[in-house]
């Protein structure tokens, strides 16, 4: 299955890294007008920076040596004007580039989130929640530095560099050639520093994903952690990953810190040679102090843009490492998509047909040669030992997965030939693990039923036996129920989930062990609500407690991915086959549980 592949980033080399960088720059295309204005500001700021070095010659020769009073007025005024205009350009350039960078990050994060939403369930089984969260947050943020900061430095510092090089060649081409000998020596170390930084950045992002996954697991599973007294163990696991992240961060700082002194050392060699030769020229009388110091000022001013350009390579490498991971998801083609000629599925009126289907996950067979017809309005329960394939079979109907072979039809329409939205609008789901959102009770009930009225929400809550406890909450229907509904009991969460399904009013209903985790009192209230929900609907029940499916129209027994029996409850018991064995096994377990309960009391 295509969707079973993970989103592990490929290893990119040479031209591929350049392609990624170009792809990042293309994200700025919609912002071309702002980028053009920012670029003009950067060019002006770069030119004005180099003009300061140009003014050193007239300042020294005309003011201090020739004592020209007129120049004493104009040069200070020119310097003030240069700094004023340069400051304004730098401000507007920073604001514009920051907007472009943040806008690109927001758009990229939206694209990434939308792409994740398109993936099938197999994608999520391959990619932990924490890793995906890290991609959307940390990896996307690393791209922002490349798009705005690195591009700004490349444009502004490169132009400043060109202007300053022009000044030093204009002032003394012989000294300029001596200075230029040093620059080629920097190319190799810059490349090596960049390679190391990219490697560390990739490892840092992987470790950050692992840390986020660990954090998400332990916080969501905090009850189990405490129940099994594993706090110390989890603290150690977190500390190990955190320590690894700290060492990688220090390594990144070390690489950055080492690159600057190395460049300073090479620059120092060049400046020492220039002072020796330039001083000799002044002593000999073939040059003036103003010319030499103008040259030297331009050369010293070259240091900062060169330093930033060496560091910008590290920023780019960090961004490319993050982009590899982000694009590895954005470029994934979802398994489950609408066909070009997909049609709308009418409301079910006849039957669901499952024709000779098979399904494999990672080449491991899960379902084999399943044939089943479910009439509209029929209640069909699926039972079997854990791993028998009952949940997988039911998940194929809303196309959470696609069949490996065979077909599923609703009223004669192959579900692969209809649009996903029209298919899934026909299906309501209530699961054992109730998923609620950190929002109000009202919005959780109305989830997926946009435009419904307050009256409809309350009617759905009443039908789900939820209205009475809702009105007793602090804010009633406006009460925010916490992450995953943690402020509510299991039975209360389940009844809100049932109210949500009632409000959706879908003709097909999937109940995935909806009462298996509830106590007896809560189960009775939920079961009553479920019976109202099931009325008049085609219902597929994944059952754990066989006592809850006695009244099903038909019970389907799956063993190792195959249907071995089907029929009504009493009929299957009379056959003394697999269903009878399951019933007897559960009856014994229930009896033992009752005995233990009596002894405890």
Swiss-Prot record:
Its EC number is 7.5.2.6. GO terms for molecular function: ABC-type oligopeptide transporter activity; ATP binding; ATP hydrolysis activity; ATPase-coupled lipid transmembrane transporter activity. It comes from Syntrophus aciditrophicus (strain SB). Residues 352-585 form the ABC transporter domain. Homodimer. It catalyses: ATP + H2O + lipid A-core oligosaccharideSide 1 = ADP + phosphate + lipid A-core oligosaccharideSide 2. It comes from the Bacteria. This is ATP-dependent lipid A-core flippase. Belongs to the ABC transporter superfamily. Lipid exporter (TC 3.A.1.106) family. PANTHER family: ATP-BINDING CASSETTE SUB-FAMILY B MEMBER 10, MITOCHONDRIAL, ATP-DEPENDENT PERMEASE MDL1, MITOCHONDRIAL. ATP binds at residues 384-391. Residues 36-318 form the ABC transmembrane type-1 domain. The keyword Transmembrane helix applies. It holds the Pfam family ABC_tran. In MsbA the ATP-binding domain (NBD) and the transmembrane domain (TMD) are fused. It is found in: Cell inner membrane. The chain crosses the membrane at residues 35-55, 77-97, 150-170, 173-193, 263-283, 286-306. Keywords: ATP-binding, Cell inner membrane, Cell membrane, Lipid transport, Membrane, Nucleotide-binding, Translocase, Transmembrane, Transmembrane helix, Transport. The keyword Protein biosynthesis does not apply.
